Structure formats: C-alpha cells, structure tokens
C-alpha cells in the first residue's frame, strides 16, 4: 500500500510510536499541529485505550491527521513503505532495556537503525532524530557525575542494550549530511511520568510484596530523572533546530545531546518520594551492591535457562544492580546552547503529576486478598531466612578442612535465602502455612 500524502500536508513518522515517551511525543505533535503524524509500530493495528479513544489522538485518527502503519524495523521494505511522503522521522523504537538478549538488541538497534537510515535516504526524508540513551557512555563500573558529551563510548558496555544503542547512535551521527539528510541524537536520562509501564508499576508491585524496603548500595548515589514531557520537548527542539537552516542547523546537526530535568536528586530519595506519594513505606534496609551482584548473576543465568519455558524477565540483573548503585548525572548545557532546550516541567511538579496519574495503584486501593498473601509471603520468607542464616553462622564457625564442603553449602543457602527474599521465589506451597506464593 502506498501512503497517500497531499502536497500541502507535512508528515512525520514516529517509530515505536506506541511506546511510553513516543505516545507523549505523538500527542504533542498533534496538539500543536506541527505535523500530520504516522505512527509506526509492530502491532498489526492500533488499539487505543479509553482515554486515547475519546481524546485528541482518537479524534486525530478519525480526521486523518494521524495514521498507523505496522512496520518491523528489521524489514527494510516495510520501513520504506512506512516512511513514504515523510519530511521528518523520530526514531524512538527499541527493545526493553532490561532484556539482555544481544541478538534481539542488535537486530533492532543496529540492523533496524541501518534500515531506518537507508529508508530515509531512499524516500527523501529531510530530518532524522534518534532517541538514544545515556547508557551509551556507561561501562558498568564507573559512575558519571555531570558528564558531558565529550565522554567517549567505553571499550565495554554494561549490557547488550547499551552496546547496541551506542552502535545505532554512531550510525545516525555518521549518516548526517548523506543525500541531504540531517541527523542528531537525544540521550534522555531516566524518563518518568504518566503512562510509564515499567518504573512505577514495578515499584508498586515490589512494595505490595514487601520487597521495596531495600536500598542497593549506600543510598548516596545521585541521578538525573527526566519528566516525559521534557523529553518530548527536547525532540521537538531538535527537529526545529535542524529545520532552522544556517548556523543554528550547522551547530545542531550531527551531534548527540544529554537531556535531563537539570535537577539531580539522590536515586533512592526519588524512589522514596514516589513510594510515599502512593502510600507505601520508604526503603530503609541497605544491602551492599557487592553482595547483590552474585545473586543477580544467578538470576540472569536462571532466566537464560528457563526463559524459553515461561520464566518472566527478572527485575534483578547485574546491569540493574550497577545502575541502582552508581551516580548517573549529566550536563545538558549543550542541548540548551544548540537546541534551545530547557525543561518545561520542574522535577517536583513532574513527580506530583506522576503520583496523581497512578492514583489507582495507591496503597489504600490494594486488594485485601493481596494484602493477606503478602503477609503470608513475608512469614514464609522470614522463616526461611532465619533458618538458613542460623545454619550459615553455625557452619561458618566450624573450622578445619572437614567443614569446607559444609561451609560452601551453607554459603549457597544464605545466598539463596536472600535471593528468595528479594525475588519472592518460594515453593508453590509451604507446609507450615499451606498457601500459594505471590506471582
């Protein structure tokens, strides 16, 4: 099917257009009538939630100002078809960053991005804005304090997502100027806000299971969290700068930009504010990252073995432990100077809006059955911890070569107890209580 575009219409494409930040970008573009918008995503058809159906997006689809096209970025033919008639492409599609599957990440973030670039050139797209990530400069060991864009890619990245996003970003920057195509890359730091399907829901799930009491590391690490409306505003600023021509365009094109709220905050303070705003307790129990790392490796190994058989993507992974315990703040001066970017929503206002948008997840709305199961889960796990730690200390106190095997086993048991407490992995039924675990 050939996309029908009239000469007077200005079209843009948003890849991954049904993702968290992408939905907000689509709505902003429609609300301010900047472009007609074509949403490109994997699903065969767009399914609107009730809010979207009755809101500006639903109206725009019915009026023809927004189109939906099913496109897999790994299929160049589909990408070319989806980009026909477009003046601008916002390339926001990427797999979930928590999935440490190199083949998947590479196929989308590198091969898919190559197809996006080639399709842009083939159909005559003028401007390409790529949603990158600050993780492209993270090696998994060294934190970043007020880092700017002069920080190079590390020899080795924290995970497959970061490594392949860096490769994709490099391809976008290298493509600047090819056949008149102008490009730049946006690196938004730790996006949050209404519509988030990962951070807040995961936080609440952990809180309801009694697992949000833990601080990984010493709790002093700073982060740059960025409200989603500021992220989409940065994308619009980038597009406008590339479209300006002259010196503004020359300075903006072919560059990468860190985007933040410009208000660094302690990571665990931010999480605590979200939890308290939703009626849950602040995390208070500190666990050294060095203790969590071997457990995280066990979790990741288990997922690699059991993932094909239905095991859910784990929350606790080695890359996640590193991210939770290090500093990650960035300097957005370059975006301010070259793109004209500055946050439009302050951090505390963003936190308030986020809490308000998740009112249905507040503690007082927790189902009674879920509360009961949580209490039972805590009892079961506490008993396991007490028994296993007692065994550990008894066996560790034993000296002599004859106790080496027992000591090793006891250490494994201790690690297992902590693993169960963090992840809620218990036998389906405990004989003492006879109740099912929480999924």
From Swiss-Prot:
One Pfam family cited in the UniProt record for this chain: 3Beta_HSD
Membrane association type: Multi-pass membrane protein
Outcome of swapping residue 320 to I: Normal activity
Residues binding NAD(+): 16-21, 161, 165
Chief subcellular location: endoplasmic reticulum
InterPro entries assigned: 3Beta_OHSteriod_DH/Estase, Lipid_A_modif_metabolic_enz, NAD(P)-bd_dom_sf
Domain Reticulon span(s) in chain numbering: 371-439
The EC number(s) this enzyme carries: 1.1.1.418
Membrane-crossing segments per the record: 381-401, 405-425
Disruption of the gene: reported phenotype: No noticeable phenotype.
CDD domains linked to this entry: 3b-HSD-NSDHL-like_SDR_e
List of catalytic residues: 165
Swiss-Prot/TrEMBL GO biological process terms: auxin transport; plant organ development; regulation of transporter activity; sterol biosynthetic process
Localization, UniProt: Endoplasmic reticulum membrane
UniProt-reported outcome of changing residue 328 to I: Lost activity
Role summary: 3beta-hydroxysteroid-dehydrogenase/decarboxylase involved in sterol synthesis. Catalyzes the formation of 3-oxosteroids from 3beta-hydroxysteroids-4alpha-carboxylate. Involved in the regulation of inflorescence internodes and leaves growth, probably by affecting auxin transporter activity possibly by altering sterol composition in the membranes.
Domain comment as written in the entry: The RETICULON domain is partial in comparison with the other paralogs.
Similarity annotation: Belongs to the 3-beta-HSD family.
Protein name per Swiss-Prot or TrEMBL: 3beta-hydroxysteroid-dehydrogenase/decarboxylase isoform 1
Lineage: Eukaryota, Viridiplantae, Streptophyta, Embryophyta, Tracheophyta
């Amino acid at each position: 099917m050939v996309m029908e575009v009239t000469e007077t219409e200005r079209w843009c494409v948003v890849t991954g257009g049904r993702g968290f930040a992408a939905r907000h970008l689509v709505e902003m573009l429609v609300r301010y009538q900047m472009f007609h918008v074509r949403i490109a995503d994997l699903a065969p058809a767009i399914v609107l939630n009730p809010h979207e159906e009755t809101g500006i997006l639903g109206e725009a689809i019915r009026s023809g100002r927004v189109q939906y096209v099913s496109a897999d970025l790994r299929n160049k033919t589909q990408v070319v078809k989806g980009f026909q008639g477009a003046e601008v492409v916002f390339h926001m599609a990427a797999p979930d960053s928590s999935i440490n599957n190199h083949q998947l990440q590479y196929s989308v973030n590198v091969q898919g991005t190559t197809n996006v670039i080639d399709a842009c050139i083939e159909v005559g797209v003028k401007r390409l804005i790529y949603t990158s990530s600050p993780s492209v400069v993270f090696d998994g060991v060294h934190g970043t304090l007020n880092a700017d864009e002069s920080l190079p890619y590390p020899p080795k990245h924290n995970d497959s997502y970061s490594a392949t996003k860096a490769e994709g970003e490099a391809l976008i920057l290298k493509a600047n100027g090819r056949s008149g195509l102008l490009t730049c890359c946006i690196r938004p730091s730790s996006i949050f806000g209404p519509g988030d399907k990962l951070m807040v829901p995961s936080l609440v799930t952990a809180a309801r299971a009694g697992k949000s009491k833990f601080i990984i590391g010493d709790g002093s690490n700073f982060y740059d969290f960025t409200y989603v409306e500021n992220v989409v505003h940065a994308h619009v600023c980038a597009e406008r700068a590339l479209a300006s021509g002259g010196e503004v365009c020359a300075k903006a094109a072919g560059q990468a930009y860190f985007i933040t709220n410009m208000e660094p905050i302690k990571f665990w303070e931010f999480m605590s504010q979200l939890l308290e705003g939703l009626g849950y307790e602040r995390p208070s129990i500190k666990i050294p990252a060095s203790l969590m790392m071997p457990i995280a490796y066990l979790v990741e190994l288990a997922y690699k073995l059991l993932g094909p058989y239905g095991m859910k993507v784990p929350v606790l992974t080695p890359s996640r432990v590193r991210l939770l315990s290090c500093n990650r703040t960035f300097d957005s001066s370059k975006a301010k100077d070259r793109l004209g970017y500055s946050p439009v929503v302050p951090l505390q206002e963003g936190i308030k809006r986020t809490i308000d948008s998740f009112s249905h997840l507040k503690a007082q709305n927790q189902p009674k059955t879920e509360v009961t199961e949580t209490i039972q889960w805590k009892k079961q796990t506490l008993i396991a911890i007490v028994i296993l730690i007692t065994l550990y200390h008894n066996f560790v106190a034993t000296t002599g070569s004859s106790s080496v095997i027992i000591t090793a086993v006891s250490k494994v048991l201790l690690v297992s107890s902590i693993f169960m407490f963090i992840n809620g992995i218990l036998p389906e039924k405990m004989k003492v209580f006879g109740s099912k675990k929480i999924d």
